[in-house]
Structure formats: structure tokens, C-alpha cells
Amino acid sequence: MKKIQNKLIELFNRYKHVWILSYFIIYLTWFGYLERTVTTHYHLIHLPIDDYIPFCEYFVIPYIMWFGYVAFGIAFTALHDKKEFYRLCAFLYTGMTVFLVISTLYPNGHNLRPYYFTHHNMFTALCEWLYSTDTPTNLFPSIHVYNSLGIHFAVMHSSYFKDKKHVQHASLVLCVLIILSTMFIKQHSVFDVSTAFMLAFVMYNVCLLYTSPSPRDGATSR
């Protein structure tokens, strides 16, 4: 019994930093409120270039893979690279909070989704399911895009993947596919994607400047 107790204490001390993941409770509660309340009387998001981007249902796959991609990045850094975990959370949480504030103060949405599908397959069925669970509101900056960039930055800066070019390349490919998917399945306007890139650029520099470990601290903390 004593050994089990000591083991639990050791695990708690080693991974006590994961408490900051409780932010997701705040985020999901706030986002859920916005999804329920921002249904009409919102500002329409649209750029002319949106009309030239065709609907392609196959991109629903990388769009859904985003959930696993983000979960992997957070879990891996939490377990193996505490300093990178803190930097990643600082990046993600700031952008997600900015998104919530914008959506609250400036309710927004789009009408880019197709009214009907000219053909049906498993991918259009997935799109139909996605449309039924996610309203076309609360759009910018796109969290799908912003968080994908954050995870890729974490992979590129993690000491664990420094010499694993295949992992870095796979992360880049998936990140790009996810970003494209937001537009090809008509979940986001180019405006949402562009604003996500702008915010990511700012936060990338801020996180590196203020939360990077100093050389004498070492690159990794377990």
C-alpha cells in the first residue's frame, strides 16, 4: 500500500503541470454558449476568393484528423517536454481566448456551405454529420488553422523530434492538409484562415521571446 501511495505521489509531482489543461473546461463552456446563442443576427464573413474555392468532400478526413493531431501534440509535450508544453499552452490558450472574445463581441458566421450535395458517398455523409454538429458561426480566427500551426511549431522546436525529419515532414503535410480542409469543405472563409496566420505569427514570436528556455537550462525538462 505504501509503495502504491509513493508511486502516486511521484506521478503527481512529475506531471502536476498538466493542471493547466483545465483551461479547456473554460473554453468548451464559453464556446458551447456561443454556439447556442450566435445563430442569427451575426456579421457575414465572406471574401470574393471564397467563391472560387470548390467544395471537395475528401478534405473532411484531414479536418477530422485535427482532433487527434492537437491531442497528440498536447499529450506528447505534457509527458516528455515540460518547457515545450508550457510554450505550446501559452500559444494555444492565448489564441483560443482571442477567438472567444472576438466571437463574443463581434458575432460572425458565413453561408459558404453547399445547400445540397450533387452526389453522395461516405465523405459527404461525414460532411453532413459535421454540419449538423457544428454551426457556421464563430469563425475567426480559425482555431483549426491556428492550433494546427501551434502543434507544428511545437514539433519543430521539440528536442525529441530534432533529428526525426520524417516526423517533422509528416507534421507539416498534415498541418497543410488541415488548413486546406477548412476551406475545401466550406467550414471557413479565406478571411478566417488569414487572420489565424496573422495571430499565429504574432504569438509565435511572443512565445519564443518570452517563454523559450535559456541555453543553460537545457532544451528539455521532464
What are these regions (language model features)?
Residues Y69-G73, G150-F153, L174-I179:
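Hydrophobic, membrane-inserted alpha-helices
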Residues Y210-R216:
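Conserved small/polar residues in nucleotide/adenosyl-binding loops
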Residues M65-Y69, Y146-N147, S194-M198:
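Membrane-embedded alpha-helical segments of multi-pass membrane proteins
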Residues E35-P48, A78-H166:
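Membrane-interface loops
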Residues L28-T29, M96-I102, V173-M183:
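Aromatic-anchored segments of alpha-helical transmembrane domains
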Residues L139, I178-F201:
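Interfacial helix-loop-helix junctions of multi-pass membrane proteins
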Residues K2-V70, T118, C127:
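N-terminal transmembrane-helix/juxtamembrane module of multi-pass inner/ER membrane proteins
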Residues H152-H157, A200-L208:
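Hydrophobic transmembrane alpha-helices
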